[in-house]
C-alpha cells in the first residue's frame, strides 16, 4: 500500500511539474511583451514631448509676430489720419440699367404681340378662303339643256316681192271747162294707164 501511494504521489508530482513548465514560459513571454510595450511607450512619449516643444516654439514665434504686426499697425494708424468721404450711391446707374431692361422687355412683348396678331389674321384669312371655296364647291352647277328640248319657231312663209311702182306727177286741171276732145283724150289715157297697171300686177 505504501508503495502504491508513493508511486501515485510521484506520478502526481511529475504531472504537476509538467504542467508548471508551460505556465512559466507563458509568464516569461508576457514579461518580454510588457518590456517591449514599455520601450515603445517611452519612445512615443519622447516623440510627443518633442512635438509639444516644437508646437510651443511655433506658438511663441506666432505670438511674437502678432505682437509685432499689432505694434506696426498701431504706429501706422497713429501716423495716418482718415478723412471722411461721402458714400457713393449707384442708384442712378441701377435705375438706368433697370429702365433699359424694362424697355427691352417691353419691345420684346410688343414684337411677340404683333406676331401673334399677324398669325391670328393669317389664320382667319385662311379659314375664310377655305369657307368660300367650300361654298363654291357645294353649289349645284346646271348643265345646258339639249337642243331637242327646245321648240323651234314656226317656219315663216316667203313673201313675193312685187316691183316698185313708178311715181308720176299729178296733172292739175287749170281750166274747169273742158272741151269734148280734151275729155276724150283724157279718158283714153286713163284707160291705157289702168290697163298697164293691171298687166303689171298680173
UniProtKB/Swiss-Prot annotation:
GO MF annotation terms: microtubule binding
Localization in the cell: Cytoplasm, Cytoskeleton
BP term (GO), one: microtubule bundle formation
An example Gene Ontology CC term for this record: cortical microtubule
Keywords: Coiled coil, Cytoplasm, Cytoskeleton, Microtubule
Tissues in which the protein is found: Expressed in seedlings, cotyledons, hypocotyls, roots, leaves, flowers, inflorescence stems and siliques.
Keyword Coiled coil tagged: yes
Matches recorded under Pfam families: TPX2 (PF06886)
InterPro entries attached to this UniProt entry: TPX2_C, WVD2/WDL1-4
Biased composition (Polar residues): 39-54, 182-202
Biased composition (Acidic residues): 27-38
Location of the region described as Disordered in the Swiss-Prot/TrEMBL record: 1-97, 142-202
Coiled-coil features, chain-numbered ranges: 92-143
Domain of life: Eukaryota
Similarity field: Belongs to the TPX2 family.
Described purpose of this protein according to its UniProt entry: Microtubule-associated protein (MAP) that regulates the orientation of interphase cortical microtubules. Able to bundle microtubules in vitro. Modulates both rotational polarity and anisotropic cell expansion during organ growth. Promotes clockwise root and etiolated hypocotyls coiling, clockwise leaf curling, but left-handed petiole twisting.
PANTHER family named among the record's database cross-references: PROTEIN WAVE-DAMPENED 2, PROTEIN WVD2-LIKE 3
Record's protein name: Protein WAVE-DAMPENED 2
Gene: WVD2
Amino acid at each position: 500500500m505504501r508503495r502504491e501511494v508513493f508511486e501515485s504521489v510521484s506520478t502526481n508530482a511529475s504531472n504537476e511539474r509538467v504542467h508548471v513548465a508551460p505556465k512559466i514560459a507563458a509568464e516569461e513571454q508576457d514579461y518580454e511583451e510588457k518590456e517591449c510595450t514599455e520601450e515603445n511607450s517611452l519612445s512615443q512619449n519622447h516623440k510627443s514631448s518633442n512635438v509639444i516643444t516644437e508646437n510651443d516654439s511655433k506658438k511663441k514665434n506666432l505670438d511674437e509676430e502678432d505682437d509685432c504686426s499689432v505694434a506696426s499697425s498701431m504706429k501706422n494708424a497713429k501716423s495716418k489720419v482718415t478723412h471722411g468721404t461721402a458714400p457713393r450711391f449707384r442708384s442712378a446707374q441701377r435705375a438706368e440699367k433697370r429702365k433699359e431692361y424694362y424697355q427691352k422687355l417691353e419691345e420684346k412683348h410688343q414684337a411677340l404681340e404683333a406676331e401673334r396678331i399677324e398669325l391670328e389674321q393669317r389664320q382667319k384669312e385662311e379659314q375664310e378662303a377655305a369657307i368660300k371655296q367650300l361654298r363654291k364647291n357645294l353649289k349645284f352647277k346646271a348643265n345646258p339643256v339639249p337642243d331637242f328640248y327646245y321648240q323651234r319657231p314656226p317656219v315663216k312663209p316667203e313673201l313675193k316681192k312685187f316691183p316698185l311702182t313708178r311715181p308720176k306727177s299729178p296733172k292739175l286741171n287749170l281750166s274747169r271747162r273742158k272741151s269734148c276732145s280734151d275729155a276724150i283724150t283724157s279718158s283714153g289715157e286713163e284707160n291705157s294707164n289702168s290697163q298697164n297697171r293691171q298687166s303689171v300686177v298680173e
